[in-house]
Amino acid sequence: LREEKLSMNNFNAKAVKDGIVKWIREFFEQNGKGCSAVVGISGGKDSSVVAALCVEALGKDKVFGVLMPNGEQVDIDASYSLVKHLGIDYCVVNIHEAIRSLKHEIKPKLGDHWSVQTSVNLPARIRMATLYAVSQTIGGRVANTCNLSEDWVGYATRYGDGAGDFSPLSKLTVTEVKAIGRELGLPEELVEKVPTDGLCGHTDEDNLGFTYAVLDRYIRTGEIDDMHTKERIDTMHERNLFKLALMPSFEYTNPVETVVLDDKQTGYGIVSEYIKKYWEHHCTEDVIVSIEISRDGKNYECLNEVASPYDMYDVEYLNDWWEGEKYIRVTGIQGISDIKIKKL
């Protein structure tokens, strides 16, 4: 309790709850007007709070719960309790057979090897695939139910519970999520339900080696009493940062070609030549040509013209602009290389 109080300084649960509700409404207005929020219901605090927030934001008729037990789930009554409390529609999809079938197919092809991490993470990824199958079928948006504390130490499965279309709780600690759950009037047994790993029955805090209260205080204040715990948290955070980043991608930049004009050349001739070259290599595609006029290093005007192989591109007006200009930059937006035309 001491740690929770220290991490909750100046946290206004009602104001934050109202802000999230407004944000959810705005998200759906812009990214799925008329769609339903699809929430994976585990019966824990995170899915309970997200579902309740969506009900307040969209109405219970626009929230659909998906219960996804892996075989027999001893605590599934908590999930039923939540959907009944909120009055939302739901379905139950048992993922056990999907997991078993994949393991049966993959394991023999990998030298009969099946890692512990695979067993831990595959159910989360099967659940996310299930949520998207439901969402696309009914016309919905999948809610991510991760919180800041779990994300901070990598306690989420990439492309599993770490996926989703919108994330109401990802900037809030476990302690703060609980406070919002109480503000929403959720039953205390759902707010305080202890999460387990679903494999050995160990709690999250057993596996982490520290409590969420300690972690939350450290995240919000930078304060921690035990230096060994601090080192453990810092190591886990650094090791798992990649889960929160966009997928690395190769950066490709179009090459820039510079043409130096003498006094006898005109911008019109050079531009026409490059447009013709583009058409020869790109068949019948139109190209957008951006003409940027610059004096003394400052941009003064920028025109955009569509050049079509069916309609001869006319840039004769460039001749009037060319007098006294330092350079004209011509860029083909749809794939043509950047062309900088400089006058001697």
List each model region and its residues.
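ATP/NTP-dependent adenylation/nucleotidyl-transfer catalytic domains that generate, transfer
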Residues: 2-39, 53-56, 61-64, 70-72, ...
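Noncatalytic modules at the cell exterior or secretory-pathway interfaces
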Residues: 275-280, 320-333
